[in-house]
């Protein structure tokens, strides 16, 4: 994605669209009793992310799956070309999917339908389920706020988790780069200040500090009558350089 701020914007947009699609296409509601509750949400490496859980439950698991995919497709379509360019690498890192900008929607849909319709997911009858995410990074100076929408079914939550893995992978791809970039900028500024300070001291010394010979010359210049030998002594205080040492033969 283009910037860390855009990650938060995209996450917010995605959450709003998922809630809206679940309500419209799966008759989900925040007031509906959920067959599955989220017990705990674990982030193995949390570097500044906040997670909240929102219930939008219904009895139609297939409609939930379609609603989540529809929300993801619309959100991806609204990204800028620069943001879309990041997405294939995130799919590979988060879900081990080899994809491209042009096929990412279809590949994600296939992944979700295959994974979330598997018997391991469908036959999961646990009433309280835990969600585990590998890692998440907050933007420099501010946390990244994520929302996990509980659909009340294993299939729906499977699709939600796949999207959550992608969004958290986006934070791990971008936030550390910005932190590193900030560090480089800081050191460049420090080096620049040191160079400018050295130049200032050099010219200040040339302008403000006078050598002993120059001081004598200034004093003599201010006197009215000075014998010519004094000038000679002042201007030739330093011994002349020896140009040649070979004896001259007559």
From Swiss-Prot:
Keywords: Disulfide bond, Host-virus interaction, Late protein, Lipoprotein, Membrane, Myristate, Transmembrane, Transmembrane helix, Viral attachment to host cell, Viral envelope protein, Viral penetration into host cytoplasm, Virion, Virus entry into host cell. Myristoylated. Induction: Expressed in the late phase of the viral replicative cycle. A lipid is attached at residue 2 (N-myristoyl glycine). It is a single-pass membrane protein. It is found in: Virion membrane. Residues 205-250 are intravirion. Residues 2-12 are annotated as: Targeting to MV membrane. The keyword Transmembrane helix applies. Disulfide bonds join 34-57, 49-136, 116-158. GO terms for cellular component: membrane; viral envelope; virion membrane. The chain crosses the membrane at residues 184-204. Residues 2-183 are virion surface. GO terms for biological process: symbiont entry into host cell; virion attachment to host cell. Component of the entry fusion complex (EFC), which consists of 11 proteins. During cell infection, this complex mediates entry of the virion core into the host cytoplasm by a two-step mechanism consisting of lipid mixing of the viral and cellular membranes and subsequent pore formation. Component of the entry fusion complex (EFC) composed of OPG053, OPG076, OPG086, OPG094, OPG095, OPG099, OPG107, OPG143, OPG104, OPG147 and OPG155. Except for OPG095 and OPG053, each of the EFC proteins is required for assembly or stability of the complex. Belongs to the orthopoxvirus OPG095 family. This is Entry-fusion complex associated protein OPG095. It comes from Monkeypox virus. The lineage of its organism: Viruses, Varidnaviria, Bamfordvirae, Nucleocytoviricota, Pokkesviricetes.
